[in-house]
């Protein structure tokens, strides 16, 4: 796996699924391939994206700045600086300085990542802030190691909370989660449908599912009534894909 592929993988792991994730993936690919060289326009686009947390925007801004060649005097962006200040906690800043000194001695991506993984997310963000604000310099490889360590920590905590939700025994949360998943699957079906004859069928199935979820939410239903809703939808989606000659397993 190349270095940039690894960076893209880690960064995308902290972006919530949806159309915006696909857009960000495309931007990252373009930046890494040297196709997008307008850093200012890129940062303006990033700043106005909805849904993303300030820290995720800060990390993406840091990656774009590291990768896109720019004039020396180009202004640093406030939204990135604010996201990478470790919540203004002086402890984070102290640890960030210690980490920075260690990173200065590293020359490889994996070496930097291993060193960084033993620090808290706040300290890692502050350390990125130091480098972003030109208070310290490290090689691009080392900076990417720092980015990936930060993303790994964030993804770990997201995974823990996701797993807690998936394994909860609270029937109301499980019911709502099934309905949300059914809704997003229906949305994906509509986006994939295109304009063929079979597409009308897929659209119809998706539309019925969304109406059903809406009705369940409006009138209130027994928490077990949503069981199988997403699975039925996925079955329909896979049957539709087979007829279209497409095989996509990723929805599971």
UniProtKB/Swiss-Prot annotation:
- Key words of the record: Host nucleus, Membrane, RNA-binding, Viral matrix protein, Virion
> Subcellular localization, per the record?
Virion membrane; Host nucleus
InterPro entries, alphabetized: Flu_matrix_M1, Flu_matrix_M1_C, Flu_matrix_M1_N, Flu_matrix_M1_N_sub1, Flu_matrix_M1_N_sub2, INFV_M1
Domain of life from the UniProt record? Viruses
- How does the entry describe its membrane topology? Peripheral membrane protein
Q: Where are the transmembrane segments?
A: none
Task: Give this protein's Gene Ontology molecular function annotations.
Answer: RNA binding; structural constituent of virion
Which Pfam families does this UniProt record tie to the protein?
A: Flu_M1, Flu_M1_C
Q: Which cellular component terms (GO) are annotated to the entry?
A: host cell nucleus; membrane; virion membrane
Q: What's one GO BP annotation on this UniProt entry?
A: viral budding from plasma membrane
Q: Where is this motif: Nuclear localization signal?
A: 101-105
- Which residue intervals make up region (RNP-binding)? 165-252
Spans annotated as Membrane-binding: 1-164
SUPFAM superfamilies named in the record: Influenza virus matrix protein M1
Q: How does it assemble?
A: Homodimer and homomultimer. Interacts with NEP. Binds ribonucleocapsid by both interacting with genomic RNA and NP protein. May interact with HA and NA. Cannot bind NP without genomic RNA.
Q: Which family does it belong to?
A: Belongs to the influenza viruses Matrix protein M1 family.
**Additional information:** Most abundant protein in virion. When expressed alone can form virus-like particles in transfected cells.
Its annotated function is as follows:
Plays critical roles in virus replication, from virus entry and uncoating to assembly and budding of the virus particle. M1 binding to ribonucleocapsids (RNPs) in nucleus seems to inhibit viral transcription. Interaction of viral NEP with M1-RNP is thought to promote nuclear export of the complex, which is targeted to the virion assembly site at the apical plasma membrane in polarized epithelial cells. Interactions with NA and HA may bring M1, a non-raft-associated protein, into lipid rafts. Forms a continuous shell on the inner side of the lipid bilayer in virion, where it binds the RNP.
User: What is the protein named?
Assistant: Matrix protein 1
**What is the phylogenetic placement of the source species in the record?**
Viruses, Riboviria, Orthornavirae, Negarnaviricota, Polyploviricotina
- Which gene is this protein's source? M
């Amino acid at each position: 796996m190349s270095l940039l592929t690894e960076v893209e993988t880690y960064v995308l792991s902290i972006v919530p699924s949806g159309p915006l994730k696909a857009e960000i993936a495309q931007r990252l690919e373009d930046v890494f391939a040297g196709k997008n060289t307008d850093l200012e326009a890129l940062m303006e686009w990033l700043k106005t994206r909805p849904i993303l947390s300030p820290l995720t925007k800060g990390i993406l801004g840091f990656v774009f700045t590291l990768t896109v060649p720019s004039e020396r005097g180009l202004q640093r962006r406030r939204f990135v600086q604010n996201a990478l200040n470790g919540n203004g906690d002086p402890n984070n800043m102290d640890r960030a300085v210690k980490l920075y000194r260690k990173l200065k001695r590293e020359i490889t991506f994996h070496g930097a990542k291993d060193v960084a993984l033993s620090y808290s997310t706040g300290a890692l963000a502050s350390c990125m802030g130091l480098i972003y604000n030109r208070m310290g310099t490290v090689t691009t490889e080392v900076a990417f190691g720092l980015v990936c360590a930060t993303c790994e920590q964030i993804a770990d905590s997201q995974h823990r909370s996701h797993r807690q939700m998936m394994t909860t025994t609270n029937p109301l949360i499980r019911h709502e989660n099934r309905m949300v998943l059914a809704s997003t699957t229906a949305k994906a079906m509509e986006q994939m449908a295109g304009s063929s004859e079979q597409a009308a069928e897929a659209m119809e199935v998706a539309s019925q599912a969304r109406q059903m979820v809406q009705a369940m939410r409006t009138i209130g239903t027994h928490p077990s009534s949503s069981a199988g809703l997403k699975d039925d939808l996925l079955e329909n989606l896979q049957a539709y894909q087979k007829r279209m000659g497409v095989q996509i397993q990723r929805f599971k």
